[in-house]
UniProtKB/Swiss-Prot annotation:
Residues 168-184, 678-690 have a biased composition (Pro residues). It is found in: Secreted. This is Adhesive plaque matrix protein. Almost exclusively composed of repeats of a decapeptide. One of its GO terms (cellular component) is extracellular region. Residues 1-20 form the signal peptide. Residues 158-167, 185-262, 288-343, 350-359, 444-486, 662-677, 691-721 have a biased composition (Low complexity). Produced by the byssal gland.
């Protein structure tokens, strides 16, 4: 087709020139075919004549092919036939030079004009917009979702299974009173830090994590779900955007008025006022709903008012209950029957599928996971998963699941064997090209969008491999130029003398070196002629090649050699005058200015960087113990000052002189009484946690060694398993840092 178009266009131009039709650029029959077609397609044709639009792509290969013929027409002999026309062509040589800029420009530009209307609007804009049209269809499912949110209201009849399920949930309200065990429970908060591995068991757990999405009574899908997050943004203006929100919110507008239908609604929700037990009187006070604003303390009822939605934000304690309901998984251990549900839960996860048989058959519906899109909260997981990643950032808790997610990523193929194996496909994201209709895969191929330049003639893909400019050496005549060209470029002047050996060199191209223009052989290469228009990016090397050596020596030296060198070579000239040790030492160079104060030499301990935080904590522990910091200068005696320090209150007046021996009497005496009053602030409830006393015993025992710290300093050495940097640093301040830190101790003593 291109050959037909080209022949027709050349014939048209040829006939126009014979008939005397000229558009200001084409002047004769022959000049129209070559010089006119090239020069006419430069500027005036695209606007003055329809060739610029349709036939421009055709003239591009013509131009690129015959652009060597800018030097070509004198060799062609048109000057002998058309000397005045040759003058005009020489007058167009500036235009050709301007087109040399256009050779860079139109091949870039008109390909943009050829295919981008198909794709630049599509790839750039559909990810923003076609998800929107595809999403409004799903957004109708959202409109079905607010209606399905009414199935949430109908789901509370299944909320009786929630009432069967809230046995864990009633431990939540019973658990906020146990919230004081939660402050005592921060030792298990370290078990939270130990819990992220169990949070990997959340990764094995997430199959039930969909019950988490169902577990918050679809409440966290409201929070984590971006559309409802928009409802948050629309929710502070609360009514206008909710008025603009689908009709489902109009039941919300009727819903505060039908707040009494909330009281009629509570077949599930009367259990809510029943478990607050104080709120039974509050629903009995529908009129005292005004008494709720009269209750500034019932501002908690205001959180329970917005639909208890803000109640959870007002439950900062229950916000800990949110990580604690991931830990309520541990609360299940604290809840003995559900503790059995724990061991049956992660391993016998299938018993879980048998556990809520009416509920996890929904999880057995992951083949009917489309029903999950129909199921509103999991459908939220759908609009979260087409982004898949943004929705995961919307899972702020599950976003931590992402960090734990890559290691347990295999566990995710175990978990979402139905679908998230597709997220395991993202390496097979080409399956996503197969996964949209492969057309969006083309949209996802804007990098392969150059493959669409390979799409129109498949030659622009060859312009797409100007890296295959080395393929130009693979091209035989330029292959000669490359062996003579790149490094043996000086050898080319040697070949200039042996240039006669060049015609003797390629026996295959003796005729071609006899035709130094080598372009009559190129017209003898009409198929390779098309390869030449496909070859234009290397063609620039061709016009740089007819100069052959002046431009190329300036070009590869200035560009290729420098581009090959600039990281190494520019770094070498830039740094050796400035600082050779700097490029050699750029990391250690920082260590050098940081090294003299010896603190950044401590950053040189970043492997012992735990020793660093242990070191500043001790140093901060000195400001945190400013009295004990003085005890640390007294502490190089290490022992007398601290016995003088703890007993300071009574033992000093009682035993000033026999003090060291009475220090033994003091551990014997205050532990009987004073250590007990000192411990109730430290937690005797912690020793009263013999069940939790394992972790807490390891933890408050760390406090007891702190108070018995000078003698039980070796128990700090037993204490390291919690903080090896800490046991390492109290010793290391004396052992690893003895010359430095003892100099500091000698400083206070000298001070």
């Amino acid at each position: 087709m291109e050959g037909i178009k080209l022949n027709l266009c050349l014939l048209c131009i040829f006939t126009c020139d014979i008939l005397g039709f000229s558009n200001g650029n084409i002047y004769n029959a022959h000049g129209s075919a070559y010089a006119g077609a090239s020069a006419g397609a430069y500027k005036t044709l695209p606007n003055a004549y329809p060739y610029g639009t349709k036939h421009g792509p055709v003239y591009k290969p013509v131009k690129t092919s015959y652009h060597p013929t800018n030097s070509y027409p004198p060799t062609y002999g048109s000057k002998t036939n058309y000397l005045p026309l040759a003058k005009k062509l020489s007058s167009y040589k500036p235009i050709k030079t301007t087109y040399n800029a256009k050779t860079n420009y139109p091949p870039v530009y008109k390909p943009k004009m050829t295919y981008p209307p198909t794709y630049k609007p599509k790839p750039s804009y559909p990810p923003t917009y076609k998800p929107k049209p595809s999403y409004p269809a799903t957004y109708k499912s959202k409109s079905s979702y607010p209606s399905s949110y009414k199935p949430k209201k109908t789901y509370p009849p299944t909320y009786k299974p929630k009432l069967t399920y809230p046995p864990t949930y009633k431990p939540k309200p019973s658990y906020p009173p146990t919230y004081k065990p939660k402050p005592s429970y921060p030792a298990t908060y370290k078990s939270k830090s130990s819990y992220p591995p169990s949070y990997k068991t959340k990764k094995t757990y997430p199959s039930s994590y969909k019950p988490k999405k169902t577990y918050p009574s679809t409440y966290k899908p409201k929070v984590s779900y971006p559309p409802t997050y928009k409802s948050k943004k629309s929710y502070p203006p609360i009514y206008k955007t909710k008025a603009s929100y689908p009709s489902s919110y109009k039941p919300k507008k009727t819903y505060p008025s039908t707040y009494k239908p909330k009281i009629s609604y509570p077949p599930t929700y009367k259990a809510k006022p029943s478990y607050p037990t104080s709120y039974r009187a509050k629903p009995s006070y529908p009129s005292t709903y005004k008494a709720k604003p009269s209750y500034p303390p019932t501002y908690k009822a205001k959180p329970s008012y917005p639909p208890t939605y803000k109640a959870k934000p007002t439950y900062p304690s229950t916000y800990k209950a949110k990580p604690s309901y991931p830990p309520t998984y541990k609360a299940k251990p604290s809840y003995p029957p559900t503790y059995k549900a724990k061991p049956s839960y992660p391993p016998s996860y299938k018993p879980k599928t048998t556990y809520p048989p009416s509920y996890k058959p929904k999880i057995s519906y992951p083949p009917t996971y489309k029903a999950k899109p129909s199921y509103p909260p999991i459908y939220k997981a759908k609009p979260s998963y087409p982004p898949t990643y943004k929705a995961k950032p919307s899972y702020l808790p599950t976003y931590k699941a992402k960090p734990s997610y890559p290691p347990t990523y295999k566990a995710k193929p175990r978990y979402p064997t139905t679908y998230k194996a597709k997220p395991s496909y993202p390496p097979t994201y080409k399956a996503k090209p197969s996964y949209p209709p492969t057309y969006k895969a083309k949209l996802s191929y804007p990098p392969t969008y150059k493959a669409k330049p390979s799409y129109p003639p498949t030659y622009k893909a060859k312009p797409s491999y100007p890296p295959t400019y080395k393929a130009k050496p693979s091209y035989p005549p330029t292959y000669k130029t490359k062996p003579s060209y790149p490094r043996t470029y000086k050898a080319k002047p040697s070949y200039s003398s042996t240039y006669k050996a060049k015609p003797s060199y390629p026996p295959t191209y003796k005729a071609k070196p006899s035709y130094p223009p080598t372009y009559k052989a190129k017209p003898s290469y009409p198929p390779t002629y098309k390869a030449k228009p496909s070859y234009p990016p290397t063609y620039k090397a061709k016009p740089s090649y007819p100069p052959t050596y002046k431009a190329k020596p300036s070009y590869p030296q200035t560009y290729k050699a420098k581009s090959s060198y600039p990281p190494t070579y520019k770094a070498k000239p830039s740094y050796p005058p400035t600082y050779k040790a700097k490029p050699s030492y750029p990391p250690t160079y920082k260590a050098k200015p940081s090294y003299p104060p010896t603190y950044k030499a401590k950053p040189s301990y970043p492997p012992t960087y735990k020793a660093k935080p242990s070191y500043p904590p001790t140093y901060k522990a000195k400001p945190s113990y400013p009295p004990t910091y003085k005890a640390k200068p007294s502490y190089p005696p290490t022992y007398k000052a601290k016995p003088s320090y703890p007993p300071t209150y009574k033992a000093k007046p009682s035993y000033p002189a026999t003090y060291p021996s009475t220090y033994k009497a003091k551990p014997s005496y205050p532990p009987t009484y004073k250590a007990k009053p000192s411990y109730p602030p430290t937690y005797k409830p912690k020793p009263s946690y013999p069940p939790t006393y394992k972790s807490k015993s390891s933890y408050p025992s760390s406090y007891k060694p702190k108070k018995t710290y000078p003698p039980t300093y070796k128990p700090k050495l037993t204490y390291p398993p919690i903080y090896k940097p800490k046991p390492s640093y109290p010793p290391t301040y004396k052992s690893s840092y003895p010359p430095r830190y003892k100099k500091k101790i000698s400083y206070p003593s000298q001070y």
